């Protein structure tokens, strides 16, 4: 009987210890101190690049994070001329098609190429590498160009 009581005390102690971890310890490494809603608000109100970067990292935890980032990437690109955001627009627009680019429509393909080229012009390294290695230019068959990128 004493063994059962001692065993029960040990189990209860272990359960109590496991429940007392702080939120910080159990949060993912890419979890910022602000909520996603707060980050989105800062992007909308001030174009805060730190908030944008934090939001893009936070959304990595979500299945459709690329698609959720798209409107904020467009805001940061179009209103605040942020190079990373131009690349993120390109990436978010093409992400649903990354396994098979053929179903993409020509307008979406043209927009994606346009944002990729602007990101490259603004000095975004990854965009420049893609543009140079695949000879991407504006006013060409955008679907064909995306096919060469994703092959």
Report the location of each language-model feature.
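Bacterial Sec signal peptide processing site at the extreme N-terminus
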Residues: 20-32
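C-terminal motif of bacterial Sec signal peptides marking the signal peptidase cleavage site
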Residues: 15-18
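Short coil/turn linking the two alpha-helices of tandem helical-hairpin repeats
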Residues: 56-65, 90-102, 132-135, 139-142
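Short coil/linker segments at helix-helix boundaries
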Residues: 67-68, 92-119, 149-150
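Bacterial N-terminal signal peptides that target proteins for export
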Residues: 1-8
């Amino acid at each position: 009987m004493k063994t059962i009581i001692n065993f029960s005390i040990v189990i209860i102690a272990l359960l109590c210890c496991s429940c007392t971890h702080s939120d910080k310890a159990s949060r993912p490494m890419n979890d910022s101190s602000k909520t996603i809603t707060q980050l989105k608000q800062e992007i909308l109100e001030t174009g805060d690049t730190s908030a944008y970067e934090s939001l893009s990292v936070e959304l990595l935890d979500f299945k459709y994070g690329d698609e959720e980032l798209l409107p904020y990437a467009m805001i940061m690109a179009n209103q605040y001329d942020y190079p990373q955001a131009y690349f993120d627009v390109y990436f978010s627009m093409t992400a649903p098609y990354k396994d098979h680019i053929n179903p993409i429509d020509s307008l979406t393909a043209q927009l994606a190429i346009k944002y990729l080229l602007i990101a490259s012009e603004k000095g975004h390294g990854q965009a420049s590498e893609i543009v140079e290695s695949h000879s991407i230019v504006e006013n060409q068959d955008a679907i064909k160009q995306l096919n060469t990128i994703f092959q």
